[in-house]
């Protein structure tokens, strides 16, 4: 179009007559104009834009042009391939398919129109000539491409890479935050495996570099940047298990068997990391290599508690049959029965009861298992515990008895179950409240009705809230105040 104003009329007519008849033909013609030596770069740019988890800056996207995808062993980041003119280079390989916008001081790269990706992922493109059809986009290969790019820049890190040098590496923060996601989505393809083996090799510093930039082994709200930028003691097996990389765990177990019980910070052992993140194939692999199931580190407790909480029935059975303590407990969350009951895994609860789990043991912050069940509202688990000679009036935890807990949480059906099986309607909690006072104060009118029908003392008072009627009135629960006594 730039030359038309200076062209003869006959030339203008010829150009207009040769214009593509459809958008697909327009895109196909643009792709055919991409130089043959650049087509793979163009393909990788499309891959990156297809599956990137967030918009990329022009500099980040230009990383595609600095990756040697045919390097020996695994794709490699070539620093000398970086360009001082990233926008011009991207336009060279992608023509008019790309556009750039300024957002908060950053130059962001994007496809020029949503129809571009629709065309590239459609079946229609496969009906065009081979040099166009080769650009067909598929999701899994796209994740493989971006995973290779992420690994390439992470493998560029070593113990001598300072903070300033890191900031000069394109896409480094994106890579640190997202490579695990892309690698999982790429199903740890053959093309990714060599890079993973280098990253998780205990003799290399690359894994420590990633952990320094973005430590996934932190709790919510904690900074991802670690305090120590050179955690060279990072345990590869622990992180591989946490990430869910089955083949890599198998490789590390066969190559570095001493790492079996190495400790991380958040979960403790590789086995607990695998169980908590539901990587069951890895968990079985570690158990079959005789992983230690007695370790009490981290926040989550030993493997039996974690497996019970996550509902991993067969692993719970395996651990119990080989002799793990059915009543093992962690100071905050209690025993396997506490956690399985609290989450509502009825099959696990039944199994634990078959192995004579103590239904009245008090531990953790809630008291006995029945109190946990009541607070969480799992009627089925409450029924299983009731059938196992549970003490309906056990005291403990924040609320007092299970009936106090049910009254506080408004659990109508569980309240009915407790009342029908001997719960004391006039029991006192630590603060001297009865269940009726608790239900009144919290505004649970239906629970109040149930308690009154079962003969609770409606005249009872305590020094903090007074009578049930006063407690309800002060909180504005008029429906409770008017419940007939």
Stretches found by the model and what they are:
Residues 313, 330, 346, 356, ...:
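Thr-biased low-complexity repeat/linker tracts and other Thr-enriched repetitive architectures
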